[in-house]
Amino acid sequence: MKIGCHGLVWTGHFDAEGIRYSVQKTREAGFDLVEFPLMDPFSFDVQTAKSALAEHGLAASASLGLSDATDVSSEDPAVVKAGEELLNRAVDVLAELGATDFCGVIYSAMKKYMEPATAAGLANSKAAVGRVADRASDLGINVSLEVVNRYETNVLNTGRQALAYLEELNRPNLGIHLDTYHMNIEESDMFSPILDTAEALRYVHIGESHRGYLGTGSVDFDTFFKALGRIGYDGPVVFESFSSSVVAPDLSRMLGIWRNLWADNEELGAHANAFIRDKLTAIKTIELH
């Protein structure tokens, strides 16, 4: 199991300087893995990232959220095509990095929709994601669909919805990405969804209810980590938190970061690393109970 940190904890810019900085700070905070947000996979500097990862002995994963212009759940074939091309380039970036986990809101746009998903849109989404998963499989990459709250997609808001989506596709490298921040909004509890998705769960985000310090909000982390222990989860566990003191203004607005709960990301990151590792250490003792 690798304990990781989202790159946006450290910087809002992923040019060469931002890539190097996020890798360095992720390692200094004690994490094993950095999650790169591929805002533009076509311009991402793979060679700089590879060099920085090798220098600091760090693993990597990558994620993204689609936009209106690349929404694969659209009924417009041109928009779906643009989204699929973006996802394919992201998969290529992962392969070039030597990484194996691609995740995020990659089945629809990451936005507040004003209407339910349509049957035609869902069919387009599944077809595009299936093709991307096939390409990723050829490159040894797992693709995990992030389940997010109702204000960020109209397609996958719960673990059970994700299971139903995956059932039709039936790709062995296609899995589910759960996030405690979103679960706290949409799920009935923090235990059942982990058990329900156990066979498909490939990636986990750890975030507090208010996007701030872990343990200071309403997320039931004790129950969540017990559930991970129950199913023997051993995939990536990645800390995610946002502050407009770091994240670019456009992304801050999209994520609804209207107040900052932290300014010192070094302290925040070190605290999160210790918090997650302490929880994982504790659940190992449950078998002795």
From Swiss-Prot:
For this UniProt record, the keywords arranged alphabetically read as follows: Carbohydrate metabolism, Cobalt, Isomerase, Magnesium, Manganese, Metal-binding
Which residues does Mn(2+) bind?
E146, D179, H205, E240
Q: Please share the entry's free-text remark on the cofactor.
A: Binds 1 divalent metal cation per subunit. Seems able to use Mg(2+), Mn(2+) or Co(2+).
| Cofactor(s) in the UniProt record | Mg(2+); Mn(2+); Co(2+)
GO biological process, any: carbohydrate metabolic process
Q: Name one GO molecular function term.
A: manganese ion binding
Per the record, pH dependence is: Optimum pH is 7.5-8.0. Is stable from pH 6.0-11.0.
* Active-site residues, as the UniProt record annotates them: E146, E240
Which Pfam family would be a valid example here? AP_endonuc_2
Q: What is its EC number?
A: 5.1.3.-
Listed under catalytic activity are: L-ribulose = L-xylulose; D-allulose = keto-D-fructose; keto-L-tagatose = keto-L-sorbose; D-ribulose = D-xylulose
| Temperature-dependence annotation | Optimum temperature is 70 degrees Celsius. Is highly stable at 55 degrees Celsius.
Highest taxon listed in the record's lineage:
Bacteria
Where in this chain does the entry annotate a coiled-coil region? none
The question of whether Metal-binding is a record keyword is answered with yes
Biotech relevance, as the record puts it, is: This enzyme is an ideal candidate for the industrial production of D-allulose, which has the potential to be used not only as a food ingredient but also as a growth regulator and/or agricultural chemical.
The record's listing under PANTHER family reads: HYDROXYPYRUVATE ISOMERASE (PTHR12110), INOSOSE DEHYDRATASE (PTHR12110:SF41)
Family to which the UniProt record says this protein belongs:
Belongs to the hyi family.
Instruction: Please give the name of this protein.
Output: Ketose 3-epimerase
Q: The organism's lineage?
A: Bacteria, Bacillati, Actinomycetota, Actinomycetes, Micrococcales
Report the gene name: DAE
